[in-house]
């Protein structure tokens, strides 16, 4: 386990059960200039030159939002697959560069939703704007500037938000790139435009330099080595869901969700994890299990390896499949998915 991971989880345990109160205290003291609300551990470590900036990353599905978050924080935190709508909730990533803490929000892709789950995902994406100092609108330069992207820009303008445009995937030749640049320059001259490649990292340093230049004097909300505030149970469920997306065909990945039902720390410093894959039909369960359980064993093995790589300790993973009809309309699952 890397030092960053150790610090991340140690911090969560130190303030377990009261992280919201801690964050509220930090914000209160940031506005008053006082440290009276903070725990002594934080008061003594408080530095007068600490700065913070929060950044929301929005855009269409598969435009590269999650890849950008992972690139900036230097860890694969947000799951990435070739399928659209992989990200279902807000994923918080954190990176501290010298005296500046950057808090990033990866969001579900914005599209024209149909079902209840899709509508909840899009609402979740828009809700993230309220927490951000900067809004990055990431645009896939390999595709035309379509009506959905126009609508996103128009809604941002209606909210008096001037987005920063990121033209992603510039490492691949595109017939649309110059036209998109010309359109944005002519119609949105007050917005900055950064051509980038989230995958290769091209121009990311310049983007980060701009982001940190907009940070304001404020105590950090997280420990210096934290990379996220997400619970480990949630991250483990996301890792398994990623493998389901990668190993199942067609529409099936959109018809399931994953919950971590049990997390048990064992004496040998390994962890036993029980997860439930929830599907809406018996036929979906049959596909996930595979012949003689071969498919779920494959998915379980790949998920376990990813968890061990991320968490840094041995994992004993047990997967179960349950059928819950119309789970997509159940608010209980939305709460678990944080949407």
UniProtKB/Swiss-Prot annotation:
It is found in: Cytoplasm; Cell inner membrane. Pfam families: KH_2, MMR_HSR1. Residues 106-109 are annotated as: G3. Disulfide bonds: none annotated. It is a peripheral membrane protein. GO terms for molecular function: GTP binding; GTPase activity; ribosomal small subunit binding; small ribosomal subunit rRNA binding. PROSITE patterns: G_ERA (PS51713), KH_TYPE_2 (PS50823). One of its GO terms (cellular component) is cytosol. Keywords: Cell inner membrane, Cell membrane, Cytoplasm, GTP-binding, Membrane, Nucleotide-binding, RNA-binding. Residues 85-89 are annotated as: G2. The keyword Flavoprotein does not apply. GTP binds at residues 59-66, 106-110, 168-171. Residues 168-171 are annotated as: G4. An essential GTPase that binds both GDP and GTP, with rapid nucleotide exchange. Plays a role in 16S rRNA processing and 30S ribosomal subunit biogenesis and possibly also in cell cycle regulation and energy metabolism. Monomer. NCBIfam families: era (TIGR00436), PRK00089.1 (NF000908), RPE1 (TIGR01045), small_GTP (TIGR00231). Belongs to the TRAFAC class TrmE-Era-EngA-EngB-Septin-like GTPase superfamily. Era GTPase family. This is GTPase Era. It comes from Rickettsia conorii (strain ATCC VR-613 / Malish 7). The lineage of its organism: Bacteria, Pseudomonadati, Pseudomonadota, Alphaproteobacteria, Rickettsiales. The gene is era.
